Design a protein with these regions (language model features):
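Sec-dependent signal peptide recognition
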Residues: 1-7, 354-357
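Residue-level hotspots at or immediately adjacent to binding/recognition sites across diverse folds
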Residues: 18-348
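Short, charged juxtamembrane terminal tails flanking transmembrane helices
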Residues: 371-374
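Generic N-terminal leader/processing signal
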Residues: 194, 368-369
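N-terminal signal peptide c-region/cleavage motif recognized by signal peptidases
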Residues: 13-15
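A short, hydrophobic C-terminal helix/tail in secreted or cell-surface proteins
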Residues: 351-368
């Protein structure tokens, strides 16, 4: 098995260099107003936010068939499943400590439905799985952002996933897989006076707080159906600089993504991954600019700007890759020639079937290993 793993990693790292992408510009609600794509499903429907000049606000939107549609609420859409159910949060995204956010779900037939809170004033939905189970965070009774709690929403009810320390604790749910496993972060004691680290809730809702980095911070962003977790964190040697990281469900740190070329300790982030184990995010280059990235082997990052022809697209750079679906389509945000933020979707040319095949084989090996050690 070890030999197969080494061979597979070699195949992935060498074949990936031949992959290129076509870019689809995801139009804004208002001309060249800012827009950001945050997630997509396997049908190619994309969600995020876009500036509406008529309301002078960022609004939750989805893109389908080349068209952008507002959900009719402010804020942003953050997740979508293959049934086209969308989740997100309303409110002012530019506020560091929002006082007006509400978690919602949206369907084409039912429109926007608010999910409620845990007794407090605010909530935000971050992700939804194939069964329609939602995670995010909400304020408890008498609480605020510094005491928010991760939640699971199913069968019409929101339930707290708890904190490490009660009642002063803090937690957030960011990603969920089809088994109902959730990842995010939590504080050891409270928000301001203790470290915050990767937290994993198993399918039964049991909280596991993992301090597996040498630094004082880590967070999980997404978990795939094989139990691989991606996110970001700090290391003691590099201070407050954050790096993309990969863990298993036992909290073992599998990889830390260096900056492009493995030099400079400039920082990176892993935002999401698919079931083939392909990871997307960004790395910081020598000019301190964010560059959208993809990793086929879970170890090495590729600057997506080097495998996409931006000529005639209106983009000068692709800055962050936020999500990837089963077909390898990638969505994110870049900088347009007028300086505004623009949403994009990338499709591999041709679709690298061999890469997904070998990636799936690797994921299968990881799954077998997981079953042996859990």
């Amino acid at each position: 098995m070890k030999s197969l793993l080494v061979l597979s990693l070699f195949f992935l790292s060498t074949t990936a260099s031949a992959v290129t992408y076509n870019l689809q510009v995801l139009q804004s609600l208002s001309g060249t107003g800012d827009s950001t794509a945050l997630a997509l499903n396997d049908n190619g429907t994309v969600v995020g936010n876009s500036y509406n000049s008529e309301t002078a606000q960022l609004e939750s939107v989805y893109w389908s068939g080349g068209s952008v549609t507002s959900l009719g609420v402010t804020g942003t859409a953050r997740g979508i499943n293959n049934s086209d159910t969308i989740v997100g949060e309303t409110g002012n995204l530019g506020t560091a400590f929002p006082v007006d956010s509400q978690a919602y779900s949206y369907t084409a037939t039912g429109g926007v439905a608010y999910l409620g809170t845990l007794g407090g004033s605010n909530a935000a939905a971050h992700a939804i799985n194939s069964s329609g189970v939602i995670t995010g965070y909400a304020y408890p009774t008498g609480g605020n952002l510094l005491q928010s709690q991760a939640f699971i929403y199913q069968n019409g009810a929101m339930t707290s996933l708890g904190t490490v320390s009660s009642p002063t604790g803090y937690s957030r749910g960011h990603g969920i897989n089809d088994a109902g496993e959730i990842v995010g972060r939590a504080s050891a004691i409270n928000f301001g006076g203790s470290e915050k680290h990767l937290t994993y809730w198993d399918a039964s809702g049991n909280l596991n707080f993992y301090n597996s980095t040498s630094g004082n911070y880590s967070t999980g962003q997404q978990i795939n159906n094989h139990g691989t977790i991606v996110g970001n964190g700090r290391e003691a040697a590099t201070g407050n600089t954050q790096f993309g990281m990969v863990w298993d469900v036992n909290g073992s740190l599998l990889n830390v993504f260096d900056s492009f070329g493995g030099t400079g300790n400039l920082g990176s982030r892993a935002w999401s991954l698919n079931d083939a184990g392909v990871i997307v995010g960004y790395g910081v280059d020598a000019s301190s600019a964010k560059r959208a990235s993809v990793s086929y082997d879970g170890v090495n990052m590729i600057d997506i700007n080097t495998v996409v022809d931006l000529t005639g697209t209106g983009f000068v750079s692709l800055d962050e890759a936020h999500d990837i679906n089963a077909s390898g389509q990638i969505v994110g945000v870049g900088t347009r020639s007028d300086g505004s933020a623009g949403a994009f979707m990338l499709t591999a040319v041709p679709v690298p079937a061999a890469i997904w095949l070998f990636g799936s084989a690797l994921a299968g090996l990881a799954w077998l290993r997981r079953k042996a050690i859990v």
